[in-house]
Amino acid sequence: MFTRAKSTAKLPSMYSLSLVLLMVISQPQLAFLAPLKAADAGAPATPSARDGQHDFEFNLGVWHTHIRRVLDPLSGSPDSIELNGTVTVRKLWDGRAQLEEIEAEGPKGHWEGLTLFLYNPQSHQWSQSFLSSRMAALQPPLVGSFNAGRGELFAQDTFRDRSILLRSVWSDITPDSHHYEESYSEDGGRTWMPAFVAQLTRDRDKTADASDIAAGAEPMSSEQEEHGFDFDFGTWKTHSSRLMHPLTGSTAWADLDGYTVVRRVWGGRANLAEYKGDGPAGHVELLALRWFNPNTHEWNIDFATPNVGMLGIPGVGKCKNGRCEFYDQEQINGRYVLVRFSIWKISDDSAQSEQAFSDDGGKTWETNWINKYTRVKPSERSARSGT
């Protein structure tokens, strides 16, 4: 729950996140890419890091919030504006992720934000990625952890063309209240200037969980760009095929079968897709956040996996006539290539998505990831869940 200036911090790429999936289902690669253990290198053993997967559980629910936003934190001026609003936080990925939506009113009118929290089990850290309704651009994540009931996450950023460190802090945590503060530092973290301060009090009359997120939407015009993903809402049986070694001439593929659930969030301006599948090498999970930018009339798509615990560089594109295509440029094996991710409607009950790479400027494309979706009817969902 915060607002930030534009940042130049580097994010992991969409390809690097999808590569994690390829690694998960490729046992030979796992052995090759496994990090050198401290004992193998002759280094002294270190205590294992504390599992922080449940550190943000206090944040779940519906909250009333009072916000003070400092207009120029680095000037030392106390001038600020105040806002009042509501924060709703839902659990995702069995607690390894959270989705937060905030609405607030202030002197400059109505303001909304969307925050995705992701836990990295390898580093035992959380990442915090934010979208503002006014900019609709994903901010690079803050990363950090909790210690003694206090959470601190950090990032490098810029404020009015000045390089700063950014810190978000959760403190004074009780079952029905907590304090959140975002601060800036120009001196390497020696001193911090508050920029965004919020006090949150639980609304005991309301609850929030993943089932509250709309799994469908009322029919809307498919010609409207902002409704380009309407066909995708719901639960889908998913068959996935992944090329194990892209751009190498290899024809070795691996298959997985699972389910994808796509839910509308943020009043329809964004949606969240959760995929869980199983193949010969085990269980795979993937989360995709897609959001519409009303300023550019474009859609963005970003991915995360449990092993990475962080969103990457988003693909950017448009949806038209039931087909959405996203592009970005990334470095693969030391070479820059184009990446294309496409998803399209086949019928009311079927759809398909593909990822492809091009190393010749888009003249030719090699598909490396194919997902085929079949809609699960409400009666089938009840039978699958055992209800």
Residue ranges and their predicted role:
Residues 1, 33-35:
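Intrinsic-disorder-linked linear interaction elements in eukaryotic regulatory proteins
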Residues 3, 21-22, 216, 387:
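N-terminal low-hydrophobic presequence detector
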Residues 5, 28-30, 382-385:
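Positively charged, low-complexity intrinsically disordered regions
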Residues 7-8, 24, 31, 40:
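Generic N-terminal simple sequence motifs
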Residues 10, 23-25, 151:
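Hydrophobic alpha-helical elements and their junctions with loops/disorder across both membrane
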Residues 15-29:
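Bacterial N-terminal signal peptides
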Residues 35-387:
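Hydrophobic small-molecule pocket/channel-lining residues, especially in calycin-type beta-barrels
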